[in-house]
Amino acid sequence: MIETNHKDNFLIDGENKNLEINDIISISKGEKNIIFTNELLEFLQKGRDQLENKLKENVAIYGINTGFGGNGDLIIPFDKLDYHQSNLLDFLTCGTGDFFNDQYVRGIQFIIIIALSRGWSGVRPMVIQTLAKHLNKGIIPQVPMHGSVGASGDLVPLSYIANVLCGKGMVKYNEKLMNASDALKITSIEPLVLKSKEGLALVNGTRVMSSVSCISINKFETIFKAAIGSIALAVEGLLASKDHYDMRIHNLKNHPGQILIAQILNKYFNTSDNNTKSSNITFNQSENVQKLDKSVQEVYSLRCAPQILGIISENISNAKIVIKREILSVNDNPLIDPYYGDVLSGGNFMGNHIARIMDGIKLDISLVANHLHSLVALMMHSEFSKGLPNSLSPNPGIYQGYKGMQISQTSLVVWLRQEAAPACIHSLTTEQFNQDIVSLGLHSANGAASMLIKLCDIVSMTLIIAFQAISLRMKSIENFKLPNKVQKLYSSIIKIIPILENDRRTDIDVREITNAILQDKLDFINLNL
């Protein structure tokens, strides 16, 4: 076992069958320490012994006693095998762009440990023990965002984490940037001296794209929950019919996501009395065409919310399954059979599952944005809002209301539409034609992560505008009451931002509500995806 502090421990046994997405999120936030079973450490040593025995037989093993990539037909002298691994890290250290935030990097460190703990990578136990010390002590390598093509895994960004294990590169420790060697001295951690295969095992995997995807899908679930809450507020603000959420309708469509969204909306509206049921509208027979006071159906953004957004809840659930599988996988090459010593050359480092699932999530992000944009448009025009003032102005003509916010939201929605294009179809040949097909998994994951920042602001704006719509109803309709769950949501918003009484800057309101969404400070109904 490794030393621990006051934080809870997460025990790694190699199988890691109890690992859940929430565990990864918790560890990525620095909330738990990593410890290992003694049985796992013994198993890893047996796997390492298998590799050492194989090397003594002068068997050519890719990346261990051969060159890398397109140079895989070149044999490396035995006395250069350890240097060969450190040299690998040197030539891969060529990333660019901003650094990943601390949460992503802690997630990467943990996922490397998970992958190597399976015992098929041929590394010594001290490799994952040292990495766990870095994670537990709070040593955060500075890892550039750009450089991976997601084939042979995330080679370039992972080289920065591997270098830090050896005391090279830059890290953040106690919120200060410093040389890795200095951080290791402060924390009394010995630099790792790589042996054969270990450099390759550290960089050859899908760990970066998996961390970004895991944290992003968790964030998307939080934002999607807020989006459904904003729809509930909008329905009340627009005095819309709830007949369309009758569970008899949705149970007949069979899709679990649609049923879930309808159930959530019904939980919000279970005590609502702010509309006349459209099914109760009557008329007197006449020979002439008559016009009803209101339509018997709402527009699609209101009526069809479960049908439109249900697939997104299913996609989030499926993405979590795929990401968890990837995190628990052995995604290295070559693999060393810890039981028989066989060397298996394959391509588990390919990130196509992550690429495809996160490209799909990018589409889902855009679809949520489109939906909320339509609801905001309804609330902002008196012709479609059942009498609310244009732009939800508290005094039309004198004040312009949320006109600027609607324009700003439209700008964000257009950005998301632009960014929703899939990355995985843009494969390009690289590295001496060895990597002639690449997954671009990190491109997909980074793209989704970037889009979520904009989506959260779009949801925030929708909440603010629906909040204003309800506030105006309260002033204009005597005894206007909200259903209990919607009232709780409304009350949690008014604790953070004021009702718009006159024209003022509203960017601060957006920032406050966005932070409240991400920090789970608003009273939304959980989706439990």
UniProtKB/Swiss-Prot annotation:
Name listed for the protein in its UniProt record: hal-like protein DDB_G0273787/DDB_G0273081
UniProt-annotated location(s): Cytoplasm
EC numbers: 4.3.1.3
GO cellular component terms, A-Z: cytoplasm
Cross-link (5-imidazolinone (Ala-Gly)): A151-G153
GO BP annotations listed: L-histidine catabolic process to glutamate and formamide; L-histidine catabolic process to glutamate and formate
Recorded catalytic activity of this chain's protein: L-histidine = trans-urocanate + NH4(+)
SUPFAM superfamilies: L-aspartase-like
